[in-house]
């Protein structure tokens, strides 16, 4: 990408020593039409933070651990703040709450093959919430319950 190429080019001249320097290099690398709303380095810094902190691995492990810990009737509620987290949460919830594709074709599904969980909710912020808290715009609340 042009961001990576520019970072490499600038580092050949001198080391990048501050986040402000890096932000400026990223800004220079992004076409003008993508610079209008928010600082163009925002998503790059988010991606770096996610990778350095292994956030998606920790997120996935945490959800799976929580699902293992709850008893019948217990619920796991997850608030996500960006699409990578939300997609991962949605996929995990789907995997544990649906009958296997092959088993769906059977006339009777054995009891031990029925899902242990049921998805209860997928909630986005209301218009009212967004009026006084615009930062909630990307938040999603997903809820799943152990049924067996």
Predicted features along the sequence, with ranges:
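S-adenosyl-L-methionine-dependent methyltransferase catalytic core, i.e., the SAM/SAH-binding region
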Residues: 1-148
